Swiss-Prot record:
Coiled coil: none annotated. One of its GO terms (cellular component) is endoplasmic reticulum-Golgi intermediate compartment membrane. Its main location: endoplasmic reticulum. This is Transmembrane emp24 domain-containing protein 10. A motif (COPI vesicle coat-binding) lies at residues 211-219. The gene is TMED10. Residues 207-219 are cytoplasmic. Keywords: Cell membrane, Cytoplasmic vesicle, Endoplasmic reticulum, ER-Golgi transport, Glycoprotein, Golgi apparatus, Membrane, Methylation, Protein transport, Signal, Transmembrane, Transmembrane helix, Transport. One of its GO terms (biological process) is Golgi organization.
């Protein structure tokens, strides 16, 4: 960046790098691993837009050697409690579903067993949106060249970025409307409170005036 007081400049290939970072920025991938103690429940939550494909793979490493009847249950639900995927005695597998609304989704692992059993290692890899699409399969079906596949991916990614910005703009408008509505209600309440205080003060003046006249303290 130049030290002069003129407009900001980006020397070298920074615009390309910035565009590349923007395209890679909203990566919709959740890859996580954690230990799950016996007779415990751990949940992960994520907000996902509507009409998006969500895919995932999980693997649960059982270090108990089958002791204590250890079993792990997997359940994926939305904020309304609707079950999108469920698997009892889960060990390793994949899941996929399409969201119907913008919502908070919850992935829960629950371990059940008896005795002293080592913690299980849970590995979860969840993708949605562009990252969930299988472009290799799309290339085979539509007979696309590698460059065409990459252009398709960039097109989908650009559309995803535009949708994210559109959603953020919508949320900003909703929050602004809520803020304006709140300010209006506060203004009306302030005016009402002021009128009540003025009315109460006026009533007190007349009441005290009559009281003092009755006591003949004033004429």
């Amino acid at each position: 960046m130049s030290g002069s007081s003129g407009p900001l400049s980006w020397p070298g290939p920074r615009p390309c790098a910035l565009l590349f970072l923007l395209l890679l920025g909203p990566s919709s991938v959740l890859a996580i691993s954690f230990h799950l103690p016996v007779n415990s429940r751990k949940c992960l939550r994520e907000e996902i837009h509507k009409d998006l494909l969500v895919t995932g793979a999980y693997e649960i490493t059982d270090q108990s050697g089958g002791a204590g009847g250890l079993r792990t249950h997997l359940k994926i639900t939305d904020s309304a409690g609707h079950i999108l995927y469920a698997k009892e005695d889960a060990t390793k597998g994949k899941f996929a579903f399409t969201t119907e609304d913008y919502d908070m989704f919850e992935v829960c692992f629950e371990s059940k067993g008896t005795g002293r059993i080592p913690d299980q290692l849970v590995i979860l890899d969840m993708k949605h949106g562009v990252e969930a699409k299988n472009y290799e399969e799309i290339a085979k079906v539509e007979k696309l060249k590698p460059l065409e596949v990459e252009l398709r991916r960039l097109e989908d990614l650009s559309e995803s970025i535009v949708n994210d910005f559109a959603y953020m703009k919508k949320r900003e408008e909703e929050m602004r409307d809520t803020n304006e509505s709140t300010n209006t209600r506060v203004l009306y309440f302030s005016i009402f409170s002021m009128l009540c205080l003025i009315g109460l003060a006026t009533w007190q003046v007349f009441y005290l005036r009559r009281f003092f006249k009755a006591k003949k303290l004033i004429e």
